[in-house]
Amino acid sequence: MATRTLIDTNILVYRYDRRFPDKQRIATEVLRDGIASGSARIAHQSIVEFVAATSRGGKEHRLLDTAAARREAEEFMVQFPILYPDTSVLRMALRGTAAYGLSWFDAHLWACAEVHGVAELLSEDFQHGRMYGTVLVRNPFLSVSPAT
């Protein structure tokens, strides 16, 4: 059985960001592999952040128009199990800000993985290879040069 993995918002966003073709390709592969293996999970928070990140700004700067962002969010909710916060996630996130010095949003995402028993968090926003509690963080974009 594949390791259960939590997908961070940045992977969802890069899937639609043509400005970074290498990251777009990797994000697409990560999501396809997650669907094929049934191992990937997405936090409620990441769906909310995805819609905001891809549809903000003027028309010329948006990755997706608002309707397309909503449609893609709906597709993610069909394709992946969505993990929702409860009081235990919120309490764990509060501890994560203190124990690991994480921002509130990063601590909340980590806490979602920790509480739901997800072993791996895929993100470029954490320290690659570090264990946060029982959750291992892996950055799938490490092979991409910083300029792309």
PLM features: what roles do these ranges have?
Residues 1-42, 59-67, 144-147:
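Short, well-structured N-terminal submotif of metal-dependent ribonuclease cores
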Residues 2, 110-148:
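Acidic, PIN/NYN-like endoribonuclease modules and their adjacent C-terminal/linker elements
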Residues 8-10, 49, 106, 125:
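Acidic active-site catalytic centers that drive phospho-/nucleotidyl reactions
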Residues 33-34, 76, 96:
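Hydrophobic helix-cap positions at the C-terminus of alpha-helices
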Residues 42-48:
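Aromatic- and histidine-enriched alpha-helix N-cap/loop-to-helix transition segments
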Residues 54-80:
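Helix-adjacent hinge/juxtasegments
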Residues 79-121:
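Active-site neighborhoods of divalent-metal-dependent phosphate/nucleic-acid chemistry enzymes
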